[in-house]
């Protein structure tokens, strides 16, 4: 009986350690993306686009207003409605 309890305890520790590691990695990536976006906004503040579709989510609208459609190639596919609303 004690062997089973020890094995279950070790298995629990392994699962808890793996989940804690993946959660920390996820939080690290989210924070890194947030700071990258802030650095991008601080470095580049183009004149802006007058053509923004208000129905799209606010991130795409904000990036399109800053002129990111012309600067970032991925904007054309990821935020197509905001970039092509003229």
Curated annotation (Swiss-Prot):
Record's InterPro entries?
ShKT_dom
Signal peptide boundaries: 1-20
* Cystine pairs: 51-86, 60-79, 69-83
Q: Which residues form a coiled coil?
A: none
Q: One GO cellular component from the entry?
A: extracellular region
Superkingdom field: Eukaryota
Named from the GO MF annotations, one term is: potassium channel regulator activity
Propeptide cleavage-removed residue intervals: 21-42
State the Pfam families in the record: ShK
Identify the residues that the record assigns to the ShKT domain, covering every copy.
Answer: 51-86
Question: Which compartments does it reside in?
Answer: Secreted; Nematocyst
Q: What is the protein's major site of localization?
A: secreted
Q: Does the keyword Signal apply?
A: yes
Which key words are in the record? Disulfide bond, Ion channel impairing toxin, Nematocyst, Neurotoxin, Potassium channel impairing toxin, Secreted, Signal, Toxin, Voltage-gated potassium channel impairing toxin
Keyword Disulfide bond carried by entry: yes
Recorded family membership: Belongs to the sea anemone type 1 potassium channel toxin family. Type 1b subfamily.
UniProt function note: Inhibits voltage-gated potassium channels (Kv1/KCNA).
Protein known as: U-actitoxin-Avd10a
Its source organism is Anemonia viridis
Its taxonomic placement starts with: Eukaryota, Metazoa, Cnidaria, Anthozoa, Hexacorallia
